[in-house]
UniProtKB/Swiss-Prot annotation:
Entry-linked Pfam families: Ribosomal_L6
GO CC annotation: cytosolic large ribosomal subunit
Protein name: Large ribosomal subunit protein uL6
Species assigned in the record: Staphylothermus marinus (strain ATCC 43588 / DSM 3639 / JCM 9404 / F1)
Taxonomic superkingdom: Archaea
SUPFAM superfamilies: Ribosomal protein L6
UniProt function note: This protein binds to the 23S rRNA, and is important in its secondary structure. It is located near the subunit interface in the base of the L7/L12 stalk, and near the tRNA binding site of the peptidyltransferase center.
Gene expressing this chain: rpl6
Length: 185
């Protein structure tokens, strides 16, 4: 197998974003907030900052190291986009007979789903991360934040909390479903 001598990716840093690199720890500050991430579990990858660019590189890379360079570069790009614009997931509450009520408990960091399929007990979904904000507007649930992984996992937790088991999904279509996601406008 051929090992390439030098693999690297460059990430441009926008003007209103500051990036601090300490070894393999990256902290990104921007208008929406700051995100810190530790990549110290990754071996043989070098992170450095030159002028207004971040360089992720490795030497004598095999297939796995080459993939890691791209993965870490993508994580850092997502951090930069998050502190600049933020991320938003939109979910739709769908029911046919029993009206579903959704309440957000910010103190306990949970979303409480009541009266799903007429059930007496509430279904609970965890809100991941301190920076994630969940709001309910009529039939829509909006999950917003600066960390794409926390926002996406929170939306997935809400969707999975209303999963229907042992019934035909074509007939029992009740639930909460993700219908739109991406960067905030």
């Amino acid at each position: 197998m051929v090992k390439l001598p030098h693999i690297y990716e460059e990430i441009d840093i926008p003007e209103n974003v500051t990036v601090e690199i300490n070894g393999l720890k990256v902290k990104v500050n921007g208008p929406k907030g700051s995100i810190e991430r530790d990549f110290s579990h990754v071996r043989n990858i070098i992170l450095r900052k030159e002028n207004s660019k971040i360089i992720v590189e490795t030497f004598f890379a095999d297939r796995r190291k080459k993939a890691l360079v791209g993965t870490i570069a993508s994580h850092i790009e997502n951090m930069i986009k998050g502190v600049l614009k933020g991320y938003r997931y939109k979910l739709k509450i769908i029911y046919s007979h029993f009206p579903i009520t959704v309440e957000v408990d910010d103190r306990n960091r949970i979303v409480r789903i009541k009266n799903f399929l007429g059930e007496k007990s509430d279904r609970i979904a965890k809100i991941i991360g301190e920076d994630v904000k969940v709001t309910v507007k009529g039939e829509d649930i909006i999950v917003e934040g600066i960390d794409i992984e926390h926002v996406g996992q929170t939306a997935a937790n809400i969707e999975l909390a209303t999963k229907v088991k042992d019934k035909d999904r074509r007939v029992f279509a009740d639930g909460i479903y993700i219908y739109d996601w991406g960067e905030e406008e």
